[in-house]
């Protein structure tokens, strides 16, 4: 096994895909073939070890990311299995933030699906090198070559084919290894544990030679020695070819494509070989950038070294009924032992580490030490939340925080028993600590508790967890759309807050420029005060006031997004000014701005993909139009049509029932949040009435 200090023999990878592409099934085979577990857990039987939550086993889907560690070819592989459903995309986001590489699993029949695109873009965001595994090659309709084309066309990637399938559908028996130019077939009675190398079938030899020539031509561009040898007509050895492929993967020049059928126990061992051979180790990504905790403008370079100061990022928090709060971290440099004290530089507090745990889904193994490249869980931390940096107290550095998506749906919840009100508050506070995409607030008018999340399934799971894990049964209101507001024009506001009450009064003057920002920008605050017009101790009051008041809206009480507020001038009074006075002045400036900056209402727009038999296409498109939807694309999908449309979320309630009705149950759909758009003038009144 790899030595603890050898970073080159470590891989931190994620398994990512669209729902039902076979991520967890692939992970279960990996754990079986690496000897991590002695039996294969099947998703459809509710026995997958990585799907440990009751809801996951009942529904056959992954809801929360699960971590484990296994060994292959003297290499330690830390694996995070992520969800494929769009409602739990936050789990993919925070996992990719701390991983060095990823395996993207595709359904060999469906190819690149909507959530495949979403997770691919998330991996692009964090520059995560990846390899592709075209799964389910045993299924009727599986088309490896069409899937490769979709990886190129829909993902904008450069696929580098390393394998070809031997056989199609039920006759799929193995793969052609283009690197070694041999066949690999699996013995079914061994559950795929035994496999054989052999000659390439004669009917595939010409195609294999063609694809290998393409492989070599692309790969040698990564290495001058290999390129010169290739141009001189020399033979490219297998070790040199692998080295070229590895360089190209780490440099994001291309993505290797392999194939198999995890459920039929074919193709997983070569996938593991590819993880070790081609995906980067922590030492291949030698430095990361952070900022000084005392001076955020000062960049700090952190080396991926066991010998440097300890730096780690907390990427997940979960509550374990036996251990309490567990904080999952990725260590970027240095070492950490149990019973240590570390600095949470994001919050400016120290934390005492109780136990260090290596996780296998929800099973725990105590370990004495972790070091650069490790992923583990810490017990005993009290104040650390997702995205916080943990570091040596003598090296206060802050890593880039994580961005979390806006919620698109909300529900009102009340405990069935009034005696459970306090228990519900405790339950929700713990669930929010675990899930940064879940927001909880109280409606100031009705007093109702409002849950805001990523979709109906997300919120349904939260309510179910309250009941199962905390014993709180809640009555739930109908789902509501999470509308937003924004501004369309710039406005410069001068506002004076002045109040005299006999004793010390209140005085604050602010000059703020409000400007619209591009969609998805959120809220930005900039301080441009010079010459002490407003003392620096009052500036946080201005920002706090704007942060609070923007949540109350301008038109219909919905949060305001995608705007910038620049504080450029103001005035204060030596006696009557205070942070509170400036907070109130900022709120007043915001309310005055609402009349001048062209406020508009925004609604979440969903990307909806509908697969329907040809004979129902007209009805389906007509229905899309009736929902204020826009058809963006239509494609042939075997004997059906794939319709891609953009439809307001508010028009999608009850759609599953309507689609079944108009297609006699033969059509299906999936939807994903795309963006916020302005509500048309003729629809604003209907939204306001809600």
Curated annotation (Swiss-Prot):
GO function terms (MF aspect): GTP binding; GTPase activity; translation elongation factor activity
One annotated GO biological process: ribosome disassembly
GO cellular component, one term: cytoplasm
Binding of GTP, residues: 17-24, 81-85, 135-138
Protein's cellular compartments: Cytoplasm
Pfam families tied to this protein: EF-G_D2, EFG_C, EFG_III, EFG_IV, GTP_EFTU
Keywords from the named record: Cytoplasm, Elongation factor, GTP-binding, Nucleotide-binding, Protein biosynthesis
Cleavable signal peptide: none
Function summary: Catalyzes the GTP-dependent ribosomal translocation step during translation elongation. During this step, the ribosome changes from the pre-translocational (PRE) to the post-translocational (POST) state as the newly formed A-site-bound peptidyl-tRNA and P-site-bound deacylated tRNA move to the P and E sites, respectively. Catalyzes the coordinated movement of the two tRNA molecules, the mRNA and conformational changes in the ribosome.
NCBIfam families: EF-G, PRK12740.1-5, small_GTP
PANTHER family hit by this protein: RIBOSOME-RELEASING FACTOR 2, MITOCHONDRIAL, TRANSLATION ELONGATION FACTOR G-RELATED
Membership in a protein family: Belongs to the TRAFAC class translation factor GTPase superfamily. Classic translation factor GTPase family. EF-G/EF-2 subfamily.
HAMAP family, sorted: EF_G_EF_2_B
Protein's name according to its UniProt entry: Elongation factor G
